[in-house]
Amino acid sequence: MHLRLLVDEPGAAAWNMAVDEALLTLALQPTLRLYGWQPHAVSLGWFQRASDFADLPPGTEVVRRLTGGGAIHHGDEVTFALAIDADRLPREVSASYRLLHDAAVRSLGELGVLCERLVAGAAQSPRPTDRWCFAQPGRDDVVTALGKLLGSAQRRVQQPRARVLHHGSIVLQRPALTPWVAATADTTAGDEPFRRRLCTLLATQFAAALDLELAPGQLTAPELALAEQLQEQRYRQPDFTRHR
C-alpha cells in the first residue's frame, strides 16, 4: 500500500479546506497533503463560535475547519493534512497523535530544531478552553523551550467508511496575529529551502510511521470536482463560517 503525496502551492483558505474534505470523503488510498496559505488566514476549529473572533482586524480571511481544536492564524508555515482509513491508525485517538507527532519531531530534529512531544499536561480536546490553538500546549503536542510548535486536530467519520482527517500546522515564522507562538525560525530557519527540506522529511517520516511506501500523486478528477463544489457551496459561504 502506498501513501499518496500531494505537495501543493499555497492556496486560499476556502480552497485548502475544500480539498481536505474532498480527500477525507473520496480518497481511495492514504493521502498526505502538504501546503501553505495565500493570503494568510485564520481557521476556526469545528466547535468554535465565530462571534468569539469579532475583534479580528478588518479584512482578515476566516474559514471554518472540518477538524476541532483552537483557531490558528495561518501565515508562514507548513500545513499537512492526512486522510486515511481509521484502521491504519491506532484505535486510541491519543495514540494516533503520538504516532504522527513523533514522526514530526524526528523530521524537525533532522533540521536542527530542538523540540519534543509533551508527555505531561492536559489531554487533547476538540473543544479547547483558549480560543487560539497555540496558546494551550497539551499532552502529546510538539513543543520547544519557547512554546507549542505544532498544532494538530482530527475529524473522524464513519460513513461511507471509517476515516480520519488529521490536520497539522508547523510554524516557520511567527504570524502577525499570534506573535507569541513558537516557530522554527526561533532556533534554526524558516526560509524556502528549509520549508522544502521539512516537507520532504515529513513525507518520509509519516510514510515510515504508517508502514507505507511513499508515492507522489495528484488529485483525481472526482476529488477535484468535489473540492470545487465544496469551496463554492460551503467554505466560501459566510453562513457556514458563522454557523456556530
Where in the sequence are the language-model features?
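Charged, often glycine-rich, active-site loop that binds/positions anionic groups
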Residues: 126-139
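Active-site loop/lid in soluble adenylation, ligation, and acyl-transfer enzymes
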Residues: 1-57, 64-65, 133, 194-244
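A glycine-rich, hydrophobic loop/mini-helix early in the fold
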Residues: 49-91
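Short, conserved charged micro-motifs
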Residues: 54, 89-93, 178-181, 197
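Aromatic/basic-lined ligand-recognition segments
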Residues: 136-143, 147-157
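Long, positively charged amphipathic alpha-helical accessory segments at protein N-termini or as interdomain linkers
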Residues: 105-126, 153-244
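Contiguous, small/hydrophobic- and glycine-enriched helical/loop subdomains that border
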Residues: 79-129
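Short, solvent-exposed loop/turn segments at the edges of secondary structure
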Residues: 75-77, 137, 165
